[in-house]
Amino acid sequence: MRILLVSQMYPGPDDPDLGVFVAQVERALAARGHDIERAVLDRRAGGKRRYAHLARRTFATARRFRPDVVHAHFLVPSGLIAALAARAPLVVTAHGRDVRNVGAVPAVAAATRLVVRRAAAVVTVSDYLRRELETKIPEARGKTHTVDSGVDLDRFRELPAPDGPPRFLHVGSLTPRKNVLRLARAFERLGEGTLTFVGDGPLRSQLEGRPGIVLTGPVRHDEIPHLLANAHVVCQPSLIEPFGQALLEAMATGRSVVATTIGGPPEFVPPEAGVLVDPADEEGLVEALRAAARLPRPNPAARAAAARHDVNEQARRLEAILERAARGRRA
C-alpha cells in the first residue's frame, strides 16, 4: 500500500523524542513492505502557526504521492488536516489528549465529529479510550478499533536486575495528572529504597531535596533501557493514563509495575506482572509499592505480558484496518 502518514508529533533533529511511538509503528509498517510518505511536524517550536505548515505539507504530499490510504495520528489537528487535504480513505488514531479535549473546547468537539464522519476507521490505543470517544462522539460507534502502539521487544529486552533494596522508577512529566506528589509521599511512608523521577515539569521543585528521591531531569528515549536496567519497579499511578507506554516498555525488560486503575493499564497489566492501584488512595499506593517490590527480579511474567503487545503484531493488526479502508470498505 501507499500510505500517507500525517502527524503533529514525529521525531526530528531538535526533538528526537517527539512522537517516538508514531515512528515506531511506522517502521513496523514499512518493514511489512508498504511505501510510506510523511507529512509531519518534528519539533514543538512554532506555536499554532506550525499547524498551517503541516496543512500545506499535507496538501502538497497528498497531491504528489497519491496515497491508497491516509493514516493520521491524533484526531485534531492532524486528523482534521488529513480529512480536508486528502481524497484517499482516512484512518485516524486517537492517543488520549485529543479525546479529552473534545469535552473541553466546543470547536474541538465539532472538528472531531467531522473527522470521525470522514474517517473509514478510527483506532484508539485502549478500550478505555474507545469507550470515552464513543460516549463523546456517538458517530464513532461501529467504526472504532483498539490497536495500541506496541513495544519494540528487540530494543526493550529482558534485563538482569540489580541487587539490594527496592529501586522505584517513574518515567514521565512531573505534573499533577501524573500524581507524582502522592507517589513521593507513598514512597516516604514505605521507608525503604530509592525513587527516581525521570522527566521534568512544574512539580519538580516540590520533589527536590526529599530523602531517597532522585531527579534526573529529561532524558532521551534511547537512554530509557539503561535506566530500567538499574530499577526494580516502574510506577505510573496517574490520575488517568489513556494507555501507558512507559509501563509497557518497562514490562518488556522484565520490570514489575505499579499502575493506575484508571485508563489503559488494566488492559495489559496482569496481577503477576504488577499491582494496579486507585490513584487517589495513598495508603493503597504504599501497599502497592511494597507488594510490587516483592515480585520476581526480573519478572518473566511482566516480559510475557508485554510480548503480547509486540509492535510487529500491532502493525499487522493496523495493516489489516488500513487495507480494508484502502479497498473502500468500512474497516
Language-model segments: residues:
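Aromatic "clamp/platform" in nucleotide-sugar-dependent glycosyltransferases that forms part
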Residues: 239
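Nucleotide-activated donor-binding/catalytic signature segment of Leloir-type glycosyltransferases, i.e.
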Residues: 205-222
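Short hydrophobic beta-strand element within catalytic cores of glycosyltransferases
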Residues: 256-259
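Conserved acidic donor-binding segment of nucleotide-sugar-dependent glycosyltransferases
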Residues: 271, 275-282, 291-296
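Short alpha-helical donor nucleotide-sugar binding micro-motif in glycosyltransferases
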Residues: 116, 218-219, 226-231
